[in-house]
Curated annotation (Swiss-Prot):
<comment type="similarity">
    <text>Belongs to the LarC family.</text>
</comment>
<dbReference type="Pfam" id="PF01969">
    <property type="entry name" value="Ni_insertion"/>
</dbReference>
<dbReference type="InterPro" id="IPR002822">
    <property type="entry name" value="Ni_insertion"/>
</dbReference>
<protein>
    <recommendedName>
        <fullName>Putative nickel insertion protein</fullName>
    </recommendedName>
</protein>
<dbReference type="GO" id="GO:0016829">
    <property type="term" value="F:lyase activity"/>
</dbReference>
<keyword id="KW-0533">Nickel</keyword>
<dbReference type="GO" id="GO:0016151">
    <property type="term" value="F:nickel cation binding"/>
</dbReference>
Length: 395
C-alpha cells in the first residue's frame, strides 16, 4: 500500500492529518487508545471524530479538546515517549519522536532557548504526533509520497504580534526538507505540527515506485472555513501499478560456513518482515576456496538491511554485507480457484500465464483417482487462462 498526502490546496495541521488518515480507512479506535494513554498521565483530553462538509467536500473532522499545559520541553518529550511506547510497535515509535525533534528544534531556533515552549505546549500535541503514528500503523503503508504543501500568504496574529506567513517556526521545520511549497490563499494554512508530520512521514517511508494506481481517497477537515477553497487535506491510498518496484538487496560472501548453517540462516531470514526471497549461489573466492554468496531481496524500507545483517552475522559471522537498491519489473498477478485448485494467473502487457499449485493438482488426482494425468490436468488449466487473456485472465 502507498500513501499519498496532498496538502497543495489548503496546507495541513495535526488534526487535518488525523482526519485524512481516518478518512482513507484507519481505525479511529487507535486514536482513542492514544487519548486514553495521555489521560492516564493526568492530562484531561477528549477527542471527537465526525464527518462534515467543507465547501461541498465530505471530510472527516477530528477535534481534540485538551486542558493543561506541557510547557516544559523535557515533560513534553517524556509524554510523547511514554504514550508511544504504550500504544505503538517498535517500527512506528520513531515517527512521533522525530516529529517532536523537528518542532523543538524550530522553537529553539526561533526563540533562542527551550526553557519555555511558545508554539507548542499542550497535550493535544501528544495526541497529534502519537495519534498520527497509531493511525499509520493501522494502515501500514509500505511507501509514501508527500506533495508540496500550501503555506498560505499574508500575515498571522500570534502572541508575539503580527508575523509573516509562513510563520518562523514553520519555516524552520521546512528547512533542510527537500520539498517545494505553494503560496496561495490568505492566512496561515500550514501549522508547525502539520509541517513536522508531513516531513517525518515523507522521510521515514520510502518513495513509491512508479507507476501506481489510486484505490481510494479521503479528506481531513481543518477548523477554519476558507473563502476561496475547501479547507481539507487529501489522502490517497494507492497500489503499485505492476511494472516497476524498488527493492533492496543485502548480499554477503562466506567461505568458512557449512551448508547446515546456511540452511538455518535461510529459514531465519525468511521469518523477517519485508524479506521477499533468499538466494544462495556457489562460487570460488580467494585462494580458490569454495564459497557461498548469500543474497537477500527485501522490500524498500529504511533500516531493513540492519535487521537482515543481524541474522547474517548471527549465523555466519560475516563481517560485512553489500546493500544496494534496485528496481525490479513485476507482472500483475492474482489467485483464482478452479474446482479446488489454486491457479496463479499473471499478466504483463499483452502476455498471460497461468500456473496451478502443484500440491493442489497432486491432491486432486490422488484423491479422485482420476484417469486424467497430472500433466494433462495442468495443461488444461494453463490453456484455460493463457493465450489471448480470456476466461478470467484479464481484469
Amino acid at each position: 500500500m502507498i500513501l499519498t498526502l496532498d496538502p497543495q490546496v489548503a496546507g495541513a495541521s495535526g488534526d487535518m492529518v488525523l482526519g485524512a488518515l481516518i478518512a482513507v480507512g484507519a481505525d479511529p479506535n487507535r486514536l482513542e487508545e492514544v487519548v486514553h494513554e495521555v489521560s492516564s498521565l493526568g492530562h484531561e483530553v477528549d477527542v471527537h471524530v465526525h464527518e462534515i462538509q467543507k465547501r461541498g467536500i465530505r471530510a472527516v473532522r477530528v477535534e481534540v479538546d485538551a486542558e493543561g499545559d506541557l510547557r516544559d520541553p523535557d515533560e513534553l518529550r517524556e509524554a510523547v515517549k511514554t504514550v508511544a511506547e504504550n500504544v505503538l510497535e517498535d517500527r512506528w515509535r520513531e515517527l512521533p519522536e522525530l516529529a517532536l525533534k523537528y518542532l523543538l528544534r524550530a522553537e529553539e531556533r526561533v526563540h533562542g532557548d527551550l526553557c519555555h515552549l511558545h508554539e507548542l505546549g499542550s497535550s493535544d500535541t501528544v495526541v497529534d504526533l502519537v495519534g498520527t503514528a497509531a493511525l499509520l500503523e493501522d494502515l501500514n503503508p509500505k511507501a509514501s509520497e508527500v506533495l508540496p504543501p500550501n503555506v498560505g500568504s499574508g500575515t498571522v496574529e500570534t502572541e508575539h504580534g503580527r508575523l509573516p506567513v509562513p510563520a518562523p517556526a514553520v519555516v524552520e521545520v521546512l528547512s533542510e526538507w527537500d520539498v517545494g511549497i505553494v503560496r496561495e490563499g490568505e492566512g496561515e494554512l500550514l501549522t508547525p505540527t502539520g509541517a513536522a508530520l508531513l516531513r517525518t512521514i515523507d522521510e521515514l517511508l520510502p518513495d513509491p515506485p512508479p507507476p501506481y494506481r489510486v484505490k481510494r481517497q479521503g479528506f481531513g477537515a481543518g477548523t477554519k472555513d476558507l473563502p476561496d477553497r475547501p479547507n481539507v487535506l487529501r489522502a490517497l491510498i494507492c497500489e503499485p501499478g505492476g511494472s516497476g518496484e524498488h527493492v533492496r538487496i543485502v548480499e554477503t560472501s562466506v567461505d568458512d560456513v557449512d551448508g547446515e548453517a546456511v540452511g538455518e540462516l535461510i529459514e531465519a531470514v525468511l521469518q523477517l518482515e519485508g524479506v521477499h526471497d533468499v538466494e544462495v549461489l556457489h562460487g570460488f573466492g580467494k585462494k580458490g576456496r569454495p564459497r557461498f554468496v548469500i543474497r537477500v531481496v527485501t522490500e524498500d524500507r529504511p533500516g531493513i538491511e540492519r535487521e537482515v545483517f543481524r541474522e547474517l552475522f548471527r549465523w555466519t559471522g560475516t563481517l560485512g554485507a553489500r546493500v544496494y537498491r534496485c528496481t525490479r519489473v513485476t507482472a500483475d498477478r492474482r489467485i483464482v480457484d478452479v474446482d479446488g485448485i489454486r491457479v496463479k494467473v499473471s499478466r504483463f502487457e499483452d502476455v498471460h500465464h497461468a500456473k496451478p499449485e502443484w500440491e493442489d493438482v497432486r491432491r486432486k488426482v490422488d484423491r479422485e483417482s482420476a484417469p486424467l494425468t497430472r500433466a494433462r490436468l495442468v495443461g488444461d488449466l494453463r490453456k484455460r487462462y493463457e493465450g489471448d487473456g480470456e476466461d478470467g485472465a484479464g481484469d
